[in-house]
Amino acid sequence: MRPFIDDAKRRVDRRLSASRQSISNSRMFASVLPERLRNDNDDDDDSQVDFSAPPGGMGPREGHMQYMHQSIFGMIAAVGSRSGFHARYDESSDSDGEDESRARKDAENLSATAGALPKRSGNESPRLSPKPQSPTPERGRRHRRTISDHKLLRPFKLNSKQNKGQEPAVQSEPQTGDEMSRASTPKRPRSVTPRAAPVLSRMVEARALLDTEDSTKGAPSTTEEIRDEGPTQKSASALSLRLKEMFGFEAPEKVLVEYACSFLQSMLLQGYMYVTEGHVCFYAYLPRKSTVAIKSGYVYKRGRKNPKYNRYWFSLKGDVLSYYADPSKLYFPSGHVDLRYGISASLAEPKDKGREVKDFQVTTDQRTYYFRADSSSSAKEWVKALQKVIFRTHNDKGSVKISFPIENIIDIEESPMVDFAETFKIRVVESEETYAIDEYYFTSFNYGQDAFNFLKGLVADTPMKRSQQTLSPQPEQTSRSRRTRGSQNRWSITSATSQSRGIGKSGNRRRSASTGQFSFGHDALSMSPPMRQQDSSLSFGNSFEQATEASGILQSMTDTTESASQILNRSDVFQSPTIRTMRRGPSGAEKTVRRHSDETARSVHTTRNGPEIQYAVSESDRDTQTPSGLHPSTPALNELVRAGVYPLQRAAGFAEYLKTRSKQMSNLLASESMGYLEKVSGMWAGGGKHYGESENILPDDQAVDPEDLEAGCKDGDRFREHFALPPSEKLQASYFAWLHRMIPLYGKIYISQKKLCFRSLMPGTRTKMILPLKDVENVDKEKGFNFGRHGLVVVIRGHEELFFEFGTADTRDDCAVTLHKGLESTKFLMASGLLAECEEKDESESATAEHRLLQEARLDITGMHSSRSAMAASNELHPIFDDPRASIINFKPTESLRITCLTIGSRGDVQPYIALCKGLLAEGHRPKIATHAEFEPWVRKHGIDFALVDGDPAELMRICVENGMFTYSFFKEATAKFRGWIDDLLSSAWKACQDTDLLIESPSAMAGIHIAEALRIPYFRAFTMPWSRTRAYPHAFAVPEHKMGGAYNYITYVMFDNVFWKSVAGQVNRWRKKELGLKATGLDKMQPNKVPFLYNYSPTVVPPPLDYPDWIRITGYWFLSEGSDWTPPAELVDFIQRARKDEKKVVYIGFGSIVVSDPSALTRTVIESVQKADVRCILSKGWSDRLGDPASAKSEVPLPPEIYQIQSAPHDWLFSHIDAAAHHGGAGTTGASLRAGVPTIVKPFFGDQFFFGTRVEDLGVGICLKKLNVTMFSRALWEATHDERMIVKAHKLGAQIRSEDGVDTAIQAIYRDLEYAKTLAQARSNVSSTPFSPTPSAKTVAEQEADEDVPEEEWTIVEDDTELEMRPTVA
């Protein structure tokens, strides 16, 4: 994968070099263009002339036609850059003071390890661990296990991202097991705040007491003694060897039986149970993380200090629970909860008995978050989903392992829970010295009874074997060591259910019902019980240190053999056993005993990332590594040492508390003020930084301070912490800039491998943005909103544009080039299918290897019936069907429907409906198209019924071309000259739609929604351009010359709806009363935004906006393939073959039936541009001087041999034989050229052509020309036929469009939304007058006004209901 990435980067570097030229205005650099196309003076007469301009006198000014985007919304665009809100925010900010102080503290902690680190060659930054992992000290990850140094997985290591850039010398450097374990527990680079005493602290206290009792009984003091005592099985099977390595047994143990079963806790964990001679083991391979949202919905959240609950949209994706104030703005979270550091998720305690609980809480190592769902069932679903994520994050490497000795099993009994599976419970005692009992529940769908019987018999035979072992002292010693080892570590899942058990003098001991034990590896025995006595007595005071508070998440696996699984240790893995009260009592010292590997080795001041770092910080802790003979061996001496150490450590803990609480005051000291001022001044000075592979600042940046080079890795740590990103997300560059939303926000831009992030640095603001690069379509450079600033526009799929401003042009250009490099690499990985693999490969790679080795070992076993049965069971489907993507409801109606499609306009408006009706015919329905008379033969040719709608489309086209579609001048002329035309249109449409069960209408026809209300039938809308309100795109008839942002985009729809309705409201309401028998209506009563909408363009061309409701669907193009029935002329085929033989590119040029002021000049422009670009052209000349300037009438210009003129040809055949297409940008023509996968040049003239021209350019598959002259057109032709980047993008986009089936998707959408449309029709009819009664009722004016107020009250959308409309559409 790496060579492909390098190639992509080199390819981008060649095109996006340091020339700093405008990416949006100069797509190809001048050095690439041929000499004939270069023009040093672009301000000459030709480059400024537009030969495609409309006839003089038709526009209001300058003799040129003012199109729609210039006539209605000009005033909005004019005032867009007037207001400057930045002046009030010029004051310096200290919002990062806490982060800077924390980073400074981390730097001091890391400085002690510099001498122990191996030196690296070159500019590569030193790494804190020989393992190829990020040098960032991940917070809260000390309980995690590293995998790359495991002796089992080392030969099977795969090429992951973490291995890139690793030097062979470091990889081969030998390490001891102790060093590896210390290197695998990076410290937490975060100030830890004190929190409440843990729920399970009594369990830990009892555990400490147990350790103290164990220390008086003696045991072997070295690992070598224990290893020598256990006999090895030379004839062990492959499965036994794998289990020995995976579970850390002393010697291979014969596998007696295995079963496919599930471990039952708050979740059902499917895996395998292996019963060996000495242990019962369970292994489960966890599935990979999901990159899609696991659960989402509205939940109330309580503030940190404010007890009020606020409603947010929550989304649980990966390891992060994010919440948003607006679900349509998913790139701007209001906050997040990082579940990688989660402890528990549980329902709140009910205040009243019998009352359903809707509150739940999530506890992390930092704080507790309180939530409230809408119902108790929703709360339970959230808790269950959160528990699964927390469980998985604590087993992040992909597998879970449980192991406990058979001799520790007390009993086994059946525990029926479900009817279709056998469930049994195993009760296990922790060790012979304690009464703590763990319970494990296992269930199996096929072999539960067999497993229960076998284990019950095995448990019954265990006392006999144990009594036989006492005859020999050597086996007794081995057995005893196994029991000790088995009880040292235990595994747990967070559970709200716990049970209390009494243990001696330590009081009630609270135990999780799901805790268990597992076995150690060889390195676990390097600490003998005498050693354990010492560290249990001297680790008391460390509970006051900050690292100890967070170390509750840790598990005592520092000394164990590394494995791919993350086995959680006891229930204190979720709670820190920190003692808050400083009371003295008779048993206080006993309650505070800790294990060395759990607490004392994890102090904040202990730097353990290097291979030579010691465990402890005090002399008493260092004594734990001395020979066992130096340790006190009696309880009395132990108590004396403990009593002497207690006051000193209590005082040290209190001093640490004061030091942490006074960190803000320390920032104000004179010794720190200069560094703070330097950082703030640097923040406001702006600029940017680049980071290398190891996140060190690249030395070729301007004004790089040597201290910044050392702090580069900490920038990456803070970046991942700010946005809750995984360690694999490497920081590549950062810039200071302004983000323009409602007001300009000054902050910092972060660019990583797959993310573009922003964080506000303004006081009082908490804006954050997390934008995946795969959702970014393009990056354009534009002028800034304010004088002296330089703008950058980020175009996002299905979202409004983002505007950034930079202080200098160089910084802006550098950010643009860096983003384009990232986009190129991301899109290349997406196209090759490598991006999805990279997102999950690192996390599950080692577990997959371990799982594969275990499966291979299982296959090696022959003659074992249980193994074969387990293999068969693993291939069986789970009996519970739970696939959210599958539909269990058949939405297709049982009877055949009479469907009418109502549309007006040109051929391009009718063609999509023919394709849709052909699909409806195939489904068994009876479709009918109601349109103009001139399209009747074409419609009936395809076997579709036809109904007549009055109106001359040619006349309609004339006023659209001359005035712009639906402009003010359009409505003015239509109102003055076409009142009768609109009346005829409405009346004929009413007649054409009779005998209809379902009506589908283009909203330009204006009559459909009223006809559906009168007929009480479901009503759909369908159109070729955006018509529904959104912030992502402007209205197709109001596209500005420059991107104006989401607020402008949304207001264009509001203004257009009102202008469009006001122009026809009088005639429509008279028609409603006279012919339909309905009362007068308005926009607030019709509620057009509630109508189901079908857009017949591709979601890859116009991605669905995030703020579209569920009933608006982008289905894909409705193509009508007619090319197979068309025979091309022989001259056309010969022309294409000659061009191929001459190795010339072939382009298509056709602008449709447009009206220009000088058609001869436009023809000459086309001819000269084709010759200058050195291409061959197929010309469809439809422009004319109709209604133009009579003085411009000239003889026809002869065409050269490089151009072949045609009258018409099917687009699906023609575009498949050319290299590029240049046209007017109509919806149908644009879809045909994009479907063919050829670069597209768009010269828009009116209507939606400006919108699709902008989309083509934003997608990077073509060029949108604002003016048409020889200079610009010839460059565009040459670039479209020679720019490999554009050609590849167009080819890939064409393949995506061809893979879609827009007609079938539209039909399925109709089926799904049919019931919803029926409810709307019924609701409208209930508040309307009686239909089918053309005679108006004889009511007074006052009565009619009173009636008209009723539907307005019932149908007006209130603000609280908008959240139901703004649900994001799931594609």
Curated annotation (Swiss-Prot):
Reaction(s) this enzyme catalyzes, per UniProt: a sterol + UDP-alpha-D-glucose = a sterol 3-beta-D-glucoside + UDP + H(+); ergosterol + UDP-alpha-D-glucose = ergosteryl 3-beta-D-glucoside + UDP + H(+)
Predominant place of localization: cytoplasm
InterPro entries cross-referenced by the UniProt entry: ATG26_PH_GRAM1, ATG26_PH_GRAM2, EryCIII-like_C, Glycosyltransferase_28, GlycoTrans_28_N, GRAM, PH-like_dom_sf, PH_domain
GO molecular function: sterol 3-beta-glucosyltransferase activity
Compartments where found: Cytoplasm; Preautophagosomal structure membrane
BP GO annotations: autophagy; carbohydrate metabolic process; lipid glycosylation; protein transport; sterol biosynthetic process
Keywords noted in UniProt: Autophagy, Cytoplasm, Glycosyltransferase, Lipid biosynthesis, Lipid metabolism, Membrane, Protein transport, Repeat, Steroid biosynthesis, Steroid metabolism, Sterol biosynthesis, Sterol metabolism, Transferase, Transport
Top enzyme class: transferase
Record field: compositional bias (Basic and acidic residues): 1-16, 591-602
UniProt xrefs under SMART domains: GRAM, PH
GO terms for cellular component: phagophore assembly site membrane
Source domain of life: Eukaryota
Signal sequence interval, chain numbering: none
Amino acid composition bias (Polar residues), ranges on this chain: 18-28, 466-477, 486-501, 1325-1338
EC nos: 2.4.1.-, 2.4.1.173
Family annotation (Pfam families): EryCIII-like_C (PF06722), Glyco_transf_28 (PF03033), GRAM (PF02893), PH (PF00169)
The protein's role, per its UniProt record: Sterol glycosyltransferase responsible for the glycosylation of ergosterol to form ergosterol-glucoside.
Domain notes: The GRAM and PH domains are required for the localization of ATG26 to the preautophagosomal structure (PAS) and are involved in autophagy.
PANTHER family documented for this protein: STEROL 3-BETA-GLUCOSYLTRANSFERASE
Family affiliation: Belongs to the glycosyltransferase 28 family.
Protein name as catalogued: Sterol 3-beta-glucosyltransferase
Species, as recorded: Aspergillus niger (strain ATCC MYA-4892 / CBS 513.88 / FGSC A1513)
